[in-house]
Amino acid sequence: MKKITRRTMLAASAAFAVAPALAQPAKVMTLVVPFPPGGSTDALARLLQAHLQTKLGRTVLVENKSGAAGSLGAAQVAKSAPDGNTYLVTFDSHAVIPAILEKPQLDVEKDLVPVFLVGTAPYVIATNANRPFKTFADVIAASKAKPGSIQYASVGIGTLGHLAMTMLAKQAGVEITHVPYRGGGPAMNDVLGGHVDLIVGS
């Protein structure tokens, strides 16, 4: 899970308060999450929302804008008024947009400006407790026995989880089927429900 400390939250509220010189306290502040509710990025945004409302005395909303591996939400923020009232809460997804989209809706290097690092998180591979896999070696063995039969969920094509699993499968010489989702919440639900074997994410 993401590592968040009280000091981090205090610094974040200070950064949001002073970074945008044109911020208008009377207006609603919006934190755009480029994934559906229920995932780790959404959970982090809601922690940040509560803290910012308390510290800044402003109304702060979380808006989930999922799709296209996070690029739709990123594009919405890029096109918003530069008044310091709209922010993107994301992880690595925006960085791969130029590589996975032929005609991206934004230039991530020019249209977005980093404000603050709120947290960090490890990437893990997890499975339903009822599945026979106890180690990644078990996953590799099952994939070798029946190529393509093992499925893993990620939060979208081209995201870090997808790329990492693709590299791991290539190094192991196996075929593992990728099942992309719009976000970590729906992906985790299907893994817990036994519809997909594995999930890779934070």
Language model regions located:
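Short, polar/charged alpha-helical segment
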Residues: 38-57, 162-170
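Hydrophobic residues within well-ordered alpha-helices
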Residues: 38, 77-78, 165, 191-192
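Extracytoplasmic "Venus flytrap"
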Residues: 31-44, 68, 154-160
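Paired acidic/hydrophobic, glycine-rich loop segments that form the ligand-binding mouth/hinge
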Residues: 84-90, 197-201
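Hinge/capping helix and adjacent helix->loop/strand transition within the periplasmic-binding protein
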Residues: 79-85, 99-186
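N-terminal export leaders
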Residues: 5-10
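Short, well-ordered beta-strand elements
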Residues: 27-36, 61, 86, 149-153
